[in-house]
Amino acid sequence: MHRAFSLYRVLELSKARVECVFELGGLVYVSNSNGDLDSYKIYNNEEEEAADFVMEHVDVYPNFTKKPITKVVSCATQDIFYALSDSQVYVYQISTFKKLFSFGAHCQNMCLYGDELIVLSSKKNLEIYEIQKNSKPNLTKTISLNDRPRSLAWVSPTMILVSLSNDFCAVNTETSRISSLNLAWQQSSSLGLGISYIGMSIKSNKLHITRISDDEVLLSKDSQGLLVNLKSLQVSRNPLRWPTVPQAVIYNSPYIITLHNQYIYIWNKETYAMIQQIGISNIYSTFSCHKNTFFTSNSYVWILTPEDFSNQIEALLNTENLNEAISVLSQITVSQFPKRDYYLRITKREKALRSFSSGDYDLAMRLFSEISESPSTVLGLFPGLLDNNYSDAISILSMAPSQNESIESNVLFPGNHSNSQTDLRNGDAVSTVANNKRLRSLSTYLTDSRRKANRFLSYDEEHYFLQKKNLFLNADGTLVAKEKLEKIAVQIDTTLFLIYMISSPALVGSLLRLPNRCETSVVETNLLSAKMYRELVEYYYGKSLHEAALDLLTKLCDEPTDTLSLKGKSNTTSKYEPILSYLEKLSPELDHLIFKYSRVPLSEDPQNSIVIFIDENSEASTISKGVVLKYLETISYKVSIIYLEKLLLDNKFNDTVFPTRLALLYLKRILELEETTDFKNQEVFKQTIEKLEDYLTNSKQYDANVVLQEINSQDEFLSTVSIILYRRLSRHQDALDVYLKILNDWEGALSYCNSVYSIDGETEPYYMLLAEISKNYKSGSLNILDFITKYSSRLDLNRVFPLLPKNISMKSYHSLFSSQFRQLFEELSNKETQSKLYQKRLEDLNEELTKVRSEKVVITREKTCLFCHKRLGKSVISIFPDGSVVHYGCAKKYVSSNHLPYEAY
């Protein structure tokens, strides 16, 4: 315990009883039972040793009120205060103490909400008043309760917390709804039972409402206290326990003050620890002012004033009560104690050092994080870590801290570490369990420091120094320079990497995938020795060390499969999958690396490797197709063909350039194969020609003229290719020349003519072939008469007769002319039949027209529409085949409603 408050007797009373004490404008006012109001000036009396505080009488306001004042609340923004006297509320001006007006009746208590609202409790009612500037408050609502309210506290503009005789409730001022808090009070023996010969009575509970902050309130019932969150109206912590039922409960940050029969107890709000016990008795009233608390008895007025926080903290530190010092400092503000941040830092720092020495590494590192201790200083607890070359991470991090390399204690705490450090070095700390605990706690601290360092480094110079409160500080409390912070960030990431390597290898990948500042040499050495190639490749990628990554992947691909420790590698037929996956992630600006390291995979496994330039998820697919194709041609025509074929399948050609280049590449590939020995029997040669023929036949995008120019007319293996191109260009004579002069294939030429006719309906090739037949009739070509007879329906006889041989007898023409006559007769017969059908149809239509014209409908004045049942009159009508008559506008609806098998127009 330490001395947090001092109690002084400041005023000896005369015959008048003190009913109220309050502070206004730097003076203390005492309301006496006779209605007089005395003002006092309170100050330290340094001349006398017996009394440190003196209340010097300043003025008196005789008969200030008819009855004594029992409670005062002030509203400094409006220069007024409210005084409760004789069950009424009087409003006075603070500067002049002039009474302005009064309001309320039968009032027993009051509570102010800012300068907007005031609530009065009278008997079993709550009266809500709206404060109006320079005028009397306006009563807005009266709420009835089941019991007399004792104490009040505003929760929000629409919610009031009220204590009744035995419970607390929340009152909604808008809806007048009253809700019990239903708090979990535990049964206490202090309630007691009073038993006498005439009966039994239960002592009533004493309930108190003490406002802690805008978000929290302390509710006291009997000998218990509950901290309640005002937003949720839920208990936030375990209950406090008073030694006896308190007469009053007061909050003076950061302490809770309870008045009992013979003592005043001071409690720490956070730890519930009793800080101080002060003896006092015969107190009948308590008044809490802005800073001080006044107690009155029948003879004296006492003042309870807080000690200076500097003295309190010094006392706690001198007694090495660090936990209590940290708790007190955490609850107060800089306005209460200007050196609050400094003392909080050095106290937490000392607590962290002692926790580390005693083996509580988690607490130590958490405290170091809270005070933003420099990582360089914390890492000093691990000897040799900062100066070593990191080649042997396990031996470095498993060492216990030595006395020389530990953080030096602050001058406020001399000589507190040597023994504990010696025990740590010689005891359990060198064990595996202790070392793992140290590593885990250090990793937690470094993770938090890493986040802070990255944020601090993102600040500009001006903003950096404005954030002094949050930045890393050196051991002497000075700010870590931004230049040094860069080096510290490297130490943090590198050390965290080493810790993960030892204690949590699974986390190494997640660290290296994020932006980091790890030392490259350290990462390479440790990951290579551990054969964690996948993590090393990810690190290289994050650092843009792409050549190093690709060199490593190339080396690993050349090794046997069982030595390739690339975790997560998918089952694939390509051993170059790791290289290809890495190349897919490189941006187009790094095309020189993509081309350099994809050459070997493309040469040996083109089908699987070419995907890096095709897949839409690959960055390499955005490289210009022309650039890629030019590069692929330096590897082989085969790879280039595969590339363009896959593009063709994806319909990525918008012009004739690349489709034409694909055809030309086929030709180059064929010529390349023709230079090999025994190429005629090679399956690949046959397949390439078949692919070219199929492509030229089915594709519509290539430029046939360009392709045709590259074909050697003397190459018999490309004759079919030439024919396809001639046909595409409608150069049928050239195509027939290839059939007849190069291939000597008359049947093939005839098939060509039939194919052109069946697809395009063109008959010109027949005449060209007929001309060739007539020239070579004697050389055993096709029989010209059989040809003309067979295809006479497709030919014009006027063009055919000049081509007929003149040295053939007329008898030979019998079959030709017979077929012609049969064809002409058939055409004539078809025309006559068609004419008769047309005539019959015309007669049927005329008959139907006559019938329709003969039909009539008589519309009388009484005839109505079958749909709307209104008279038809002279309206436009629709007549249906069954004789139904409706309005023209009702026709469609009539058809729809009756489901008729025809439409109305």
UniProtKB/Swiss-Prot annotation:
Residues 15-293 form the CNH domain. GO terms for cellular component: cytoplasm; cytosol; fungal-type vacuole membrane; nucleus; vacuolar HOPS complex; vacuole-mitochondrion membrane contact site. It is a peripheral membrane protein. Keywords: Membrane, Protein transport, Transport, Vacuole. InterPro entries: Clathrin_H-chain/VPS_repeat, CNH_dom, Vam6/VPS39/TRAP1, VPS39/TGF_beta_rcpt-assoc_1, VPS39/TGFA1_Znf, WD40/YVTN_repeat-like_dom_sf, WD40_repeat_dom_sf. PROSITE patterns: CHCR, CNH. CHCR repeats lie at residues 614-786. It comes from the Eukaryota. GO terms for molecular function: guanyl-nucleotide exchange factor activity. It is found in: Vacuole membrane. GO terms for biological process: autophagy; endosomal vesicle fusion; intracellular protein transport; positive regulation of TORC1 signaling; vacuole fusion; vacuole-mitochondria membrane tethering. Pfam families: CNH, Vps39_1, zf-Vps39_C. Required for vacuolar assembly. Acts as a component of the HOPS complex that acts during the docking stage of vacuole fusion. HOPS is required for vacuolar SNARE complex assembly. It remains bound to SNARE complexes after vacuole fusion. Belongs to the VAM6/VPS39 family. Component of the HOPS complex. PANTHER family: CNH DOMAIN CONTAINING, VAM6_VPS39-LIKE PROTEIN. This is Vacuolar morphogenesis protein 6.
